[in-house]
Design a protein with these regions (language model features):
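Short beta-strand edge/turn micro-motifs at domain boundaries
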Residues: 113-130
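Short, aromatic-enriched amphipathic alpha-helices that serve as compact interaction elements
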Residues: 24-43
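Surface-exposed, charged secondary-structure patches
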Residues: 66-113
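Bacterial N-terminal signal peptides that target proteins for export
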Residues: 1-7
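C-terminal motif of bacterial Sec signal peptides marking the signal peptidase cleavage site
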Residues: 14-17
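Bacterial signal peptide processing site
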Residues: 19-21
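Short, well-ordered alpha-helical segments enriched in acidic and aromatic residues
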Residues: 42-56
Length: 130
């Protein structure tokens, strides 16, 4: 195969690869899923840090939020078994207002499932839970 024929084949693929962008819905949904996966893994501080706060919060208040996340997961574990899976079903985005709703399906160890809506806010290019 000649050199020009290879470039004729590779150039369109490079063009598609470089222009293919992830949708805002995918990004917001993936962020929400990641935050809830952190909660499921017991990474409570990371989960709490996933909430949008325009101002900093006192350390003792942050600790209370972490304790609340621990209590929430402990209660769910008692009632349904551990949080076994987090799946993104869909997300909607309002690009003008920089907000989104991510729809997550939570699966528990007792095989029960619950769909939740996670409201999101975009700040400086990152998605946070509201």
């Amino acid at each position: 195969m000649k050199k020009t024929n290879i470039w004729a084949l590779v150039a369109p693929l490079l063009l598609i690869a470089c222009t293919d962008r992830t949708s805002p819905e995918d990004v917001a949904g993936a962020a929400a899923k990641t935050y809830y996966q952190q909660l499921a893994k017991g990474q409570y501080a990371e989960y709490v840090d996933g909430f949008y706060r325009p101002d900093s919060i006192p350390t003792h208040y942050r600790q209370q939020l972490i304790e609340n996340a621990k209590m929430f997961l402990a209660e769910q574990t008692r009632e349904r078994g551990s949080l076994a899976g987090v799946h993104l079903t869909r997300a909607t985005v309002d690009t003008a207002l920089h907000t989104a709703n991510a729809f997550l399906l939570l699966t528990f160890a007792d095989s029960s499932r619950e769909e939740i809506v996670v409201p999101m806010a975009q700040h400086r290019g990152l998605w946070y839970m509201r």
